[in-house]
Amino acid sequence: FNAEVVYSIDLKVKKASSSYHITKHQPTFLDSIKVAIDSKIVDSLYKSTVAHSFLQKGKRYRDENFRKEANRLTALFRNAGVYHFSKNQIGFYEIDTLAPNHKTNVLMKITDRLSEKEGTITSQPLQVQKISKIGVFTDYSYARKDELYRDTVHYDGYAFFSHDKLKYRPKTFLNAVFIEPGQIYKDSMRNLTRKHLKLLKNFKLVKIRYKEINDKELSASIVLTPMKKYAIGINTEAIHSN
């Protein structure tokens, strides 16, 4: 910051050259770092990992560290059950990179969730939510989206739905599923489940959706569109065990 650039042109016969001279001044460093977090749950999670923050007193001011910190906190909260958290709830304020003492304070604010109902925007406390119901829809297709599922199998807390007779053995199938009943919401488990189901190469589409039951519980739906050539079923050897 606060660098000076001097531009000069050297004119000669049939030739001209230009040069830039950049003078770097003293960089800005972080001074006090204050935090204002609306949610007690989120505040507790933040404090438990503050030692890993990219923003530390005495460190040089860098834009990229603010982006890294926002990404770190978003991943932390969304893998600790805070399903409704999004990066735009994090804001950084009171930053002055032109301060004469080359130090800047930082105020980080993390707000509660904002929701809209009937045109009114309200603030709702962020909560840790658990997954209480998991449905696996094994043969979804747009052409049959309005049809009722004829076959339903319940196994170990999961409900399997199929338009025709279920072609998969639930116990074997679940080796590729890392989302479990009673588990807190985690982005990592959602991504891992999607990855392993795609690795089976049985399904053309893999979608994982969540729906809020109440402020403490979520339901999860694993929606699968099979490839025709794999309509017979899943080979046990193709499953990656968890």
Where are these regions (language model features)?
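Immediate N-terminus of the mature polypeptide
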Residues: 1-242
